Design a protein with these regions (language model features):
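Glycoside hydrolase catalytic-domain context in secreted enzymes
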Residues: 1-388, 406-849, 863-895, 899-928
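Extracellular acidic, Ser/Thr/Pro-rich low-complexity tracts
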Residues: 302, 854-856
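Short beta-strand edge segments in extracellular beta-sheet folds
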Residues: 395-404
Length: 928
């Protein structure tokens, strides 16, 4: 098999294994699970018929050849008997209560209407041995969850269903097909005998869940978030959702760091928790402590009667010192292999001291802007979750400066944060302290550290291939580029640029004729992270969501899965997947938590790095996102994250730091929102001081799509892109035409005024070019891919053929030669296609004009792909028009013959079309 051969069976096997290992068993009274051979199974809940493979928004828009739901997988089981009469009752009810898809982007309901479980239904099902109750939830981009029934809370109908079924069946299993954790108080109230978080497992998700329910896979997933009794128990809830300022008053005490320190009694299920069908004993010890790391050993013994895996988790309790610390902090973890009953596996876990160090943002410990280890006794806890980890060693540490840095991204708005204080009963209470304010001027720092300008030479005949082959220095190559070339390179083009793989997010690099003449290839990126989004309808593999990946605690398995995704990217000529998502689960209501991993930064970093490494091993790369503090969807373009520098570094940036330093990430995406008054897309201290100077990052930084920036103290605008250039945010994503500057950005204006210099533009261009020279695009440009591998890439199956039967034809007007089509009744839901024929009077040049609108906001992404005789001509991605009609025109080119057909493919719901015009542009010149 060649380098780009994609073994779809192995891909599916790995995805299924991840989906299974992600399942978290919270409860299993009296060995309710696994299902037993011959079990008669009653399935309740419409979610059995409406499986959520992923959440909403760009992270979930993956077209797939198939999706295996939990019900599909159940029906494939030969050793259990499904109650088909009960399923038929649901099927008939669903016909009268169809799936509600909402109105497109950001409007899909969090859940679907549920059927009431009447007494007669229970009588129908009473002969079964076990009941499976399916609960489904979704949320996503531009759509936070809410503390309401049908979202974070169960509806009355759902609660009644669980109550009645749990009373009627000796064995009741509630399966949660959700992206985020939800309220769980109903478990204590209705007492189902088993509860399983199944997450959103991608296209193989159903198979993975059934592997666990049947016992083919022993559940080994662990919670990546603390499940508290009430949403109000999370300290971030107080400020979550504010449209203007979100104060991070809880500081570093996020998730279990807060609950284990201050509120253990408010926890239902602790971080890292998850049951197995067997029992394990973990005996851990500290092996050694050196200047660089600590080494721990854990012996894991299977004391039960079923083979399975276990996760060893290592926590630290650092001395409070002057800074204050959480009572527990995860510093390492490792998953065992399959351990047979009675057998033992020894694990060695190496933990860098940098994972243990604390950042002094005030100087109270004597070393401001340093990561330090305060003097005192450090206790090690090893176990299967944060609550049950046992003390397994301790060591004394002298005061140590681990890393000396400089202040960056500190707040400018005064507020208070929490800090532990020990009372007379040896219990930690909350004390409030003032957060240190910013003392440096980032603008002065930026101008002081400007790169030296490379003198412009004009075209000397150098091509990028000469740099690639070490014949010419990169600076000499860049010296040829005019300021207009450099500005154009700053602007990525998209969405769905015709210059790269159809339906993808953006093109960048050699996107103008001038840049192409220098031998700069056009690179491509596609939305992720749970698979490749291609809005033209091209199929890709849909993967388990980010939370599911985290719950595996299996770094090696995640890496293997994403190596397959890397091969898939290469086969589709995509140079970077826009993922992994690595923001912190600060609050359970964040709509995009499904894309992200955990409330813990170390786990987030390790799982994110595994995805990056896997993709890069295959030859493509990943874009880690969103840097940083992008922790709510409400008002995501404008809400200012007011956060201490310590919390930024220890919590919200730490995972990204691990992905850069350990995963060798080469691409980063900033956020929509400001952090401490500066929009991240234009934050020099974020994009340069921290990312490049401190972490050693040498890749590209790109904005989120249609992001804004501000000059500090002023409002943000989309036109004000000069701060992005100055900050070393290399790529603005994205515009329809880089050369024409359709958004009227101010980069050229600020260049001519002297605020943006040639050296700023050259520096950013060098970053882009260095990235491209390591990309698949460069290998294609230089014909460095073997004939065998090219055949593998170009020989993929095309399953987009159109049936010509029953196509309605529209005929050209005799006078104008135009065809006007009333499109008001077109099927326009996500995944729909409209196919129609056109019959022309004249050979010649034609355009297609489409008049359309959307009620959604300007950050909505509504792709519409245009096929002409089964060839993709263009994909239009419009943003929400807030109800205003707009007309988009695309070239069809020179058309021969009379009869042809057009297909419109809707990549998202919510786009209304008024009319389609096939516009005759003239006879033109024959193209031969």
């Amino acid at each position: 098999m060649g380098k780009y051969s994609l073994d779809l069976k192995e891909y599916a096997r790995l995805a299924r294994e991840v989906a299974a290992e992600s399942c978290v068993l919270l409860k299993n009274d009296n060995n309710t699970l696994p299902l037993k051979k011959g079990d008669k199974v009653a399935v309740f809940g419409r979610s059995a018929f409406n499986y959520y493979k992923s959440g909403l928004g760009s992270g979930g828009l993956v077209n797939t050849k198939y999706v295996v739901s939990i019900l599909d997988a159940l029906r494939n089981e030969k050793d259990i008997v499904l109650d088909e009469d009960l399923l038929e009752i649901y099927s008939e009810w669903i016909k009268e209560n169809p799936y509600d898809e909402g109105h497109g982007w950001g409007t899909v309901p969090w859940s679907q209407k549920e059927m009431k479980v009447e007494d007669y239904i229970l009588r129908v099902a009473k002969e079964n041995d076990i009941a499976l109750v399916m609960i489904g939830r979704t949320a996503g981009e531009d759509q936070d969850s809410k503390n309401e029934a049908g979202s974070y809370l169960l509806t009355d109908v759902e609660k009644d269903m669980i109550k009645k079924v749990s009373k009627s069946f000796r064995r009741t299993v509630v399966v949660l097909n959700v992206g985020n954790i939800i309220d769980m108080k109903w478990v204590d109230e209705y007492n189902p005998s088993a509860v399983l978080y199944a997450w959103q497992g991608g296209q193989e998700g159903g198979n993975g869940v059934i592997d666990v329910l049947t016992g083919r896979v022993n559940p080994c997933g662990k919670l990546t978030d603390t499940i508290a009794k009430n949403i109000e128990d999370y300290p971030s809830t107080k400020n979550f959702g504010d449209p203007e300022r979100n104060y991070y008053e809880e500081d570093i005490y996020v998730g279990y760091r807060y609950f284990e320190s201050f509120a253990k009694e408010k926890v239902m299920y602790p971080f890292g928790y998850g049951l197995s069908y067997t029992s394990f004993d973990i005996k851990g010890k500290l092996v050694e402590s050196t200047h660089e790391e600590i080494v721990v050993e854990a012996n894991v013994t299977n004391n039960g009667n079923m083979s399975g895996k276990e996760v060893v988790q290592v926590y630290i309790e650092a001395p409070q010192g002057k800074l204050g610390k959480p009572v527990r902090a995860l510093v390492g973890f490792k998953k065992t292999g399959i351990i047979k009953p009675g057998e033992c596996e020894k694990l060695i876990i190496n933990i860098p001291k940098s994972y243990i160090a604390s950042y002094d943002d005030s100087g109270v410990a004597g070393y401001k802007s340093c990561y330090i280890l305060e003097e005192g006794l450090y206790k090690i806890y090893i176990g299967a979750d944060v609550r049950n980890a046992e003390e397994s060693g301790q060591y004394d540490e002298k005061f140590t400066i681990v890393e000396s840095l400089e202040e960056a991204c500190a707040p400018i708005v005064e507020f208070k944060r929490i800090k532990p204080i020990l009372d007379e009963n040896n219990k930690f209470n909350i004390e409030n302290e003032e957060v240190p304010m910013r003392r440096i001027n980032p603008k002065e720092r930026m101008f002081k550290n400007r790169d030296e300008e490379i003198i412009y030479t004009g075209d000397r005949g150098y091509k990028l291939a000469d740099v690639f082959e070490n014949k010419v220095k990169l600076d000499d190559f860049v010296a040829q580029l005019s300021y207009n070339d450099l500005i154009c390179m700053f602007r990525g083009e998209g969405m769905c640029s015709p210059k790269v793989t159809p339906g993808t997010a953006a093109a960048f690099g050699g996107i103008t004729e001038s840049l192409r003449n220098f031998g700069i290839p056009v690179a491509c990126c596609a939305d992720g992270p749970s698979g490749i989004r291609m809005d033209c309808g091209t199929n890709a593999f849909s993967l388990p969501n980010g939370t599911a990946l985290g719950c595996t605690f299996n770094v090696d398995l995640v890496k293997k899965l994403y190596k397959m995704t890397g091969i898939e990217l290469c086969r589709n000529k995509i140079d970077s997947l826009l993922g992994p998502g690595m923001n912190i689960h600060r609050n359970p209501l964040n709509g995009r938590n499904f894309e992200y991993v955990s409330e813990d930064p170390i786990l987030t970093g390790k799982i994110g790095a595994a995805q990056v490494i896997g993709i890069q091993e295959a030859g493509s790369t990943a874009t880690i996102k969103h840097v940083c503090a992008n922790n709510q969807e409400a008002s995501r373009r404008f809400v200012d994250s007011i956060v201490s520098e310590r919390a930024l570094r220890e919590i919200y940036l730490k995972g990204f730091e691990i992905a850069v330093k350990e995963g060798k990430a080469r691409s980063v995406m900033t956020t929509y929102n400001p952090v401490n008054g500066i929009w991240t897309a234009g934050s020099y201290d974020l994009c340069t001081t921290i990312l490049r100077k401190e972490w050693g990052f040498d890749g590209i930084v790109m904005t989120d799509w249609w992001a804004e920036a501000n000059t500090e103290g002023e409002k943000s605008t989309r036109e004000n892109k000069a701060p992005m250039v100055l900050a070393q945010n290399d790529l603005y994503m994205c515009v329809s035409n880089s050369l024409e500057n359709p958004e009227n950005d101010n980069v050229k204006e600020r260049f001519e005024a002297g605020e943006v210099t040639r050296s700023d533009l050259q520096r950013n261009a060098k970053n882009i070019l260095k990235f491209i020279m390591k990309s698949q695009a460069m290998l294609h440009e230089l014909n460095l891919i073997s004939k065998e591998d090219l055949e593998e890439i170009n020989g993929q199956d095309d399953d987009g053929n159109i049936s010509l039967e029953d196509i309605v034809y529209y005929y050209a007007d005799k006078d104008s030669n135009d065809i006007i089509i009333d499109a008001s009744n077109f099927n326009n839901k996500k995944g729909d296609s409209e196919v129609f024929g056109i019959s022309l009077n004249e050979l010649g040049l034609y355009n297609i004009e489409i008049t359309m609108k959307s009620e959604q906001g300007s950050l909505s992404q509504l792709p519409l792909s245009i096929y002409y005789d089964n060839a993709l001509k263009s994909t239009i991605t419009i943003r929400g028009t807030e109800g205003e009609w707009v007309t988009e025109s695309r070239e069809l080119g020179f058309i021969f013959g009379v009869n042809h057909y057009i297909k419109l493919y809707f990549g998202a719901s919510g786009l209304d079309i008024d009319k389609v015009v096939i516009k005759f542009m003239g006879k033109g010149k024959l193209p031969f």
